[in-house]
């Protein structure tokens, strides 16, 4: 839910920037899609919002979100003996939506195209540990997403669903969120 909410926020920001002529574009094209690929075991949240630069990914994902999420998740896992109860308690908690993705995913990729001119598309990858990889998005990464080339702004968050999150590969479970 939090990931979809973040995607909606990004599209709303893009619409607002278009309305005040800060950027060019069509505000009607700012959409969010949830793409389930059971065969590849991925769940992608795709938005046509403002996107993020490498600097913004570092700030919002690596610094702000990660620092608060680690301590919070540890406290919740100590409190709940049952792992599934811990997951339910954490998911949806304000500010932890992004890192709650690791409770169902073995790996998360962020691929983002900033709306700001001169910013290279960025790819961030993490397996839930404190270690991550971040750098320019390759042409192969872009092609693999199957994104429309006219839509060179926004963010794809790709969850590579693990065994514990298998229920999130079912249409009904996704529709319930």
Task: Name each model-derived stretch.
Residues 173:
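Short, flexible catalytic-loop segment of classical short-chain dehydrogenase/reductase
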Residues 1-163, 168:
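GHKL (Bergerat-fold) ATPase N-terminal catalytic module, capturing the glycine-rich phosphate-binding loop
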């Amino acid at each position: 839910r939090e990931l979809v909410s973040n995607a909606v926020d990004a599209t709303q920001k893009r619409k607002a920037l278009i309305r005040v002529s800060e950027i060019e574009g069509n505000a009607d094209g700012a959409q969010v899609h949830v793409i389930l690929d059971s065969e590849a075991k991925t769940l992608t949240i795709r938005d046509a919002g403002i996107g993020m630069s490498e600097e913004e990914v570092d700030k919002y994902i690596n610094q702000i979100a990660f620092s608060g999420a680690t301590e919070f998740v540890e406290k919740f896992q100590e409190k709940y003996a049952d792992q599934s109860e811990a997951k339910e308690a954490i998911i949806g908690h304000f500010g932890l939506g992004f890192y709650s993705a690791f409770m169902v995913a073995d790996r998360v990729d962020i691929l983002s195209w900033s709306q700001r001119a001169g910013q290279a598309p960025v790819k961030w990858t993490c397996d839930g540990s404190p270690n991550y990889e971040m750098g320019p998005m390759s042409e192969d990464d872009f092609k693999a997403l199957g994104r429309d080339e006219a839509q060179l702004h926004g963010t794809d968050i790709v969850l590579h669903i693990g065994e514990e999150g298998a229920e999130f590969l079912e249409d009904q479970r996704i529709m319930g969120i």
